[in-house]
Amino acid sequence: MGRSLKKGPFVSQKLLAKIDAQLESGDRKPIKTWSRASMITPDFVGLTFLVHAGKNFATVYVTENMVGHKLGEFAPTRVFKQHGGIGKK
């Protein structure tokens, strides 16, 4: 079940403040955030985020195709260790 339309998308207020500060200063550094649940809005297009992925931060460059998704979708939290290959039993 999705979020109610009357509520609108969730975006962290701290994250919005960081984005506004960066747009005013013209700085192009990545924005560090722990808010994986924040929805990507059209204002985010062209910005780079460092999204917390458990132990480290994943670099996420936002494009138009990402609008409507959440930041956490683009920062995987698990590392796949390959299953057995040649010589493994």
Curated annotation (Swiss-Prot):
GO terms under cellular component: cytoplasm; small ribosomal subunit
Signal sequence coordinates: none
Pfam families: Ribosomal_S19
The keyword RNA-binding belongs to this UniProt entry's keyword annotation: yes
Keyword Ribosomal protein: yes
InterPro entries: Ribosomal_uS19, Ribosomal_uS19_bac-type, Ribosomal_uS19_SF
Keywords: Ribonucleoprotein, Ribosomal protein, RNA-binding, rRNA-binding
UniProt GO molecular function: rRNA binding; structural constituent of ribosome
One biological process term in Gene Ontology: translation
Family according to the record: Belongs to the universal ribosomal protein uS19 family.
HAMAP family xrefs: Ribosomal_uS19
Biological role stated in the UniProt entry: Protein S19 forms a complex with S13 that binds strongly to the 16S ribosomal RNA.
Name of this chain's protein: Small ribosomal subunit protein uS19
Gene: rpsS
